[in-house]
From Swiss-Prot:
Protein name: Isoleucine--tRNA ligase
Species assigned in the record: Mycolicibacterium paratuberculosis (strain ATCC BAA-968 / K-10)
Subunit structure, interactors included: Monomer.
Protein residues bound to ATP: 634
Ranges for region Disordered: 1-30
The enzyme's E.C. designation: 6.1.1.5
Length: 1053
């Protein structure tokens, strides 16, 4: 009968007057997924999560912000990764004494939701939404974003993440939205929100502009794309260059009908060249690039500085806007380069930021013949109705053949080629974007950009380089943020305008109270179309005919999520005191792309509204990649079902795989089944087996104590004390991957050294060993609890019978005895044994074959002297010699790190390399290296210990010394090795026949004649190791064949 945590016996069921024993795990390999489900069931019945928070009532709060995911699909590994970190840090902080509320959030607005509904309803055009009605469409959006909430809850719970779903926040909730419009009103009142006409990235499929930061979140926003690249000549009229053609280069032929000017760099040299019966003007540095068309040495008719060309007039390639004042002349542009193209840039002010800026300065009004769907309108009749990208071939045809409107001004198509380049695409619908001048509302980020840079210095980033790298550089170049979207499902921009320009007025609202005051009704839904229905007479119109109407735009969804810290608690309308004493938050985590997304918008709004950072510590992890090496994405569906991984390997295994990887240091990670299973092999299974070993061999429950005099006990306790300090340091710094590595190394020392070397003590029921392992496992379970919450719960409850390891405190500093000298010495012993074992394996000298001698050459051999017998026993050698004569067995090979040293040393680095190669480098006492004329710092060179005889010599890690194995095998050693092989086989036979480890046995052995002498010589050794009180040579009854022709029978005495 199993109890609720998979054990065969429940401690509470044991009679009070009986000897209390550990609950014993079920036999066979542990089924971690099944055990985890039992833990989850126990937590649910026990309400352990709420208890963990309640026990910290009154304690200092640690504020964690849960970045809201879009819930319009099921979670993938990227969500799991972030979720694990969101679980680990709060668990750790709770154990350290903080109260950590964990409130789940849902990001519900914006294009992701709208596009999903459009897909479900077969909508392909915004006009279809208007036809069905905004109310019906938004109702469908509301239903869609909440459709998967139950599945999300199941997945998050299955990953053993503790988070409060019952008090979650949703960005669509009225209180949340009220806080968002409050934030907008605050920006307006501060003069930091304004309406402007700018060139912005624009999605013609979704008919809305995007903000610049949305184009920089992920690399896949800029996939490679092939576009036509044209070199076109515009004919000059008047002046010295009359009749010549100004050569421009463009990868957007569709913008040529909107050409209003060209730009040159004032300081670049331009030339007029003759080619056949035509003359062309281009930048002199670009002549060679056009040798095919212009000839290798074209006749140069004149040379001009760019400044001399300013004001030159020309005919545009298409005549649609010939009456535009001040247009069709050469302007100055500092952005013009000669790295590609012709050095002359065609300007279509409505479709380029630089174009707009230069044209504005020249008094040229932009023209916008492309409508909101990305199609040419009636102003360009030849291409009317065509999408701009579909129009490209027709435009090229007309330019090439002088047909259509291109015939009017005689442009010359000099070159038509295909150009492959990264091109921005909509991050949701995946269509190529265009740049288009639109009216939009902006946050004036440039007004407080420098302050954002300053406040960033108060944030602790992990990895650290993000602060002044990816995030800091982005802040330094931040531009005003376009926050309006011409869409439906989102928080409304709370701006009402007069519908009569003769009586202009703008009203901005920041609360339900303000809306009720002016409109006489208190909204119970701030979404469209209901908010749009609030109108009132314009107070500034004495005629009483004009009306105040809300502008139709909604806010960028990133404004919603960036408002999360205050909007989730309905600040400032509720919880004012709490928010103002708990802001900024202590910790957030998301993937690195959020430096342009959530991290950025949090920082923008926090700086503008509160002049403070939004968060104190931020983990920006790398990207989990799918099987195709691309970022995992719901839309690409390039990842296996998460539930399959949980069912096969378990959540702790997945957690370990992700948390121990380089992804938390900013690297990327491809999920593999083998990687997940390695987590089971490296940590989960060894830790579980250590508990199982204790439960199996301990006659009663151990006592928590740390006073054993035995050296191995003292070592593992001191090693554990170091682990406690290491994990505390790493977890305080949110360096979770480093914490995992520290735990892995300790688990290796615990199971593959301490337990293995102490087995005989457990078999003999040594109280020191049992109590020490009990203590070590109890403390380790607490230390590992945030990282492996399920398996540690099982082990800790098995050890203690307590309610939950997650209701305990983090081990205190000084709780365990420290002994750094012993730890250093024993760790070096382990390194010696590991290196020598590798030599054995390489030479195919089996472990049970004794060898004559091991020589250990280290700097301070006296530190290893107390452990000579241990080394000899571990390695099965007859003697161990310690020496400090390292140079007898190897030499240190020095290498100059030219890449590091070069910038500082200049040409002296080559002299240093030459001196080192000649053996003239000298390592100084302070760690520097004198080589020729240079003194190199420790990071500017490396030192590697190289064995003189690599066949039987191996170096210790970090150049600490060498081990030399004597591989001579004598007949006597071969005989002893033969006996030890039989001992192993007999031990296996004991186990397979069901004998207890302490049972004494009788043995009858038949040995081939050629091995009889070996068997007689080592009879006592064999008998002693297998607990045989009677041992005879002869013909056994019912014999069992073991190795090398030996047959035996055994029986319990």
């Amino acid at each position: 009968m199993t109890d609720n945590l998979g054990f065969q016996a429940d401690r509470e069921a044991q009679p009070a007057d009986s000897v209390q024993t550990y609950p014993k795990p079920a036999g066979g390999a542990p089924d971690f997924p099944a055990l985890e489900l039992e833990v989850l069931d126990y937590w649910a019945r026990d309400d352990t999560f709420r208890a963990s928070i309640a026990r910290r009532d009154g304690a200092e709060e640690y504020v964690f912000y849960d970045g809201p995911p879009f819930a319009n699909g099921l979670p993938h590994y990227g969500h799991l990764l972030t979720g694990y970190v969101k679980d680990i840090v709060p668990r750790y902080r709770t154990m350290r004494g903080n109260k950590v509320e964990r409130r789940f959030g849902w990001d519900t607005h914006g294009l992701p939701a709208e596009l999903e509904v459009e897909r479900q309803l077969g909508i392909t055009d915004k006009s279809q939404i208007d036809d069905m009605g905004i109310a019906a469409f938004n109702d469908a959006c509301r239903e869609s974003v909440l459709r998967y909430t139950d599945e999300w809850r199941a997945y998050v719970t299955r990953q053993a993440r503790w988070v409060d779903f019952d008090h979650d926040y949703k960005t669509l909730d009225l209180p949340y939205m009220e806080s968002v419009i409050w934030a907008f009103k605050q920006l307006w009142d501060k003069g930091l929100a304004y309406e402007g006409y700018r060139v912005l990235p624009y999605c013609w499929r979704d008919e809305t502009p995007l903000s610049n930061h949305e184009l920089r979140m992920d690399d896949d926003v800029y996939p490679s794309r092939q576009d036509p690249a044209l070199t076109v000549g515009f004919k000059v009229v008047g002046g010295e260059l009359d009749g010549a053609h100004l050569l421009i280069w463009t990868t957007t032929p569709w913008t040529l009908p909107s050409n209003l000017a060209v730009a040159v760099h004032p300081e670049v040299t331009y030339v007029q060249v003759r080619s056949g019966d035509r003359r062309f003007v281009l930048a002199q540095p670009r002549l060679a690039a056009y040798a095919r068309e212009l000839g290798p040495e074209p006749e140069i008719l004149g040379s001009y500085r760019g400044a001399e060309l300013l004001g030159t007039r020309y005919l545009p390639p298409f005549p649609y806007f010939m009456d535009n004042p001040n247009a069709f002349r050469v302007l100055a542009g500092e952005f013009v380069t000669t790295e590609d193209g012709t050095g002359i840039v065609h300007l279509a002010p409505a479709y380029g930021e630089d174009d707009m800026a230069v044209a504005d300065a020249a008094g040229i009004a932009p023209v916008t013949p492309v409508d909101s769907n990305g199609r040419f309108d009636a102003a360009v009749p030849d291409y009317q109705g065509l999408n701009v990208f579909d129009a490209n071939p027709q435009i090229i045809w007309d330019l090439k053949n002088g047909s259509g409107a291109a015939a009017a001004n005689a442009p010359v198509l000099l070159r038509h080629e295909t150009y492959e380049h990264p091109y921005p695409h909509c991050w949701r619908c995946r269509n190529p974007l265009i740049y288009r001048a639109v009216s939009s509302w902006f946050v004036a980020v440039t007004r407080f950009r420098d302050r954002m840079v300053e406040l960033n210095q108060q944030i602790t980033w992990y990895p650290e380089h993000v602060k002044d790298g990816q995030f800091g550089k982005w802040l330094a170049g931040a531009r005003d943020w376009s926050i309006s979207r011409n869409r439906y499902w989102g928080t409304p921009i709370p701006v009402w305008k007069s519908d009569d320009p003769a009586y202009p007025r703008i009203d901005v609202y920041g609360s339900l109270d303000e809306l009720e005051r002016d409109f006489g009704v208190r909204p119970d839904n701030l979404h469209r179309p209901y908010i749009d229905e609030l109108t009132r007479p314009n107070p500034d119109d004495p005629s009483g005919r004009s009306t105040m109407r809300r502008i139709p735009d909604v806010l960028d969804v990133w404004f919603d999520s960036g408002s999360m810290p205050y909007a989730q608690v309905h600040y400032p309308f509720e919880n004012r005191d709490w928010f103002e004493t708990h802001y900024p938050g202590d910790f957030i985590v998301e993937y690195i792309g959020q430096t342009r997304g959530w991290f950025y918008t949090l920082h923008v709004l926090a700086t503008a509204l509160f002049d403070r950072p939004a968060f104190k510590t931020c983990v920006a992890h790398g990207i989990v990649l799918g099987s195709d090496g691309q970022k995992m994405s719901k839309s690409l569906r390039n990842y296996p079902d998460v539930s399959e991984v949980f069912d096969r390997d378990g959540s702790d295994a997945m957690r370990w795989f992700l948390m121990a990887s380089p992804i938390l240091r900013g690297g990327n990670l491809i999920v593999t089944e083998q990687g997940i299973r390695d987590g089971v092999r490296q940590v989960l299974l060894p830790f579980w087996n250590a508990y199982s070993f204790l439960a199996l061999y301990a006659p009663k429950i151990g006592t928590w104590r740390t006073d054993s005099p035995q050296v191995l006990d003292r070592y593992i306790l001191a090693k554990l004390a170091e682990l406690r300090d290491d994990l505390t340091r790493e977890m305080d710094a949110c360096d979770i991957s480093r914490a995992c590595e520290q735990l892995r190394q300790f688990t290796e020392a615990l199971t593959n050294w301490y337990v293995r070397r102490s087995r005989s003590r457990f078999w003999s029921e040594d109280a020191d060993a049992i109590d020490t392992l009990h203590t070590v496992l109890e403390v380790t379970a607490r230390l590992a609890a945030p990282l492996l919450p399920s398996v540690t719960e099982l082990v800790w409850r098995g050890l203690t019978g307590g309610r939950s390891v997650h209701l305990t405190d983090w081990p205190r500093s000084g709780e365990l005895p420290a002994d750094p000298g012993l730890v250093a010495a024993m760790d070096q012993v382990r390194e010696v044994c590991s290196a020598a074992s590798s030599l054995r394996k390489a030479k195919k000298l089996r472990v049970r074959l004794p060898l004559p001698k091991l020589t250990v050459a280290v700097e301070n051999p006296q530190h290893l002297a107390p452990f000579v017998d241990l080394i000899a026993d571990e390695l099965n050698v007859k003697s161990v010699e310690l020496t400090d004569a390292i140079d007898t067995y190897g030499t240190f090979e020095l290498t100059v790190n030219a890449r590091v040293a070069g910038p500082r040393l200049g040409k002296d680095v080559q002299a240093a390399i030459k001196a080192v190669k000649a053996g003239e480098g000298v390592v100084n006492a302070d760690g520097t290296l004198t080589a020729g004329p240079a003194v190199l710092r420790p990071e500017e060179y490396s030192s590697r210990l190289v064995a003189a005889d690599p066949e039987f010599t191996a170096a210790l890690p970090n150049g600490a010394g060498l081990v030399v194995l004597d591989g001579t095998v004598t007949p006597e050693l071969e005989a002893e090795g033969w006996a030890k092989d039989r001992i192993r086989e007999l031990q296996e036979l004991r186990k397979s026949t069901g004998l207890d480890v302490s049972d004494r046995i009788s043995v009858v052995m038949s040995v081939p004649a050629g091995r009889a002498e070996w068997a007689r010589t080592h009879r006592d050794l064999i008998a002693g190791e297998i607990l045989a009180t009677r041992f005879e040579f002869g013909e056994p009854a019912d014999p069992v064949a073991i190795g090398d022709g030996v047959r035996v029978s055994i029986s319990k005495v």
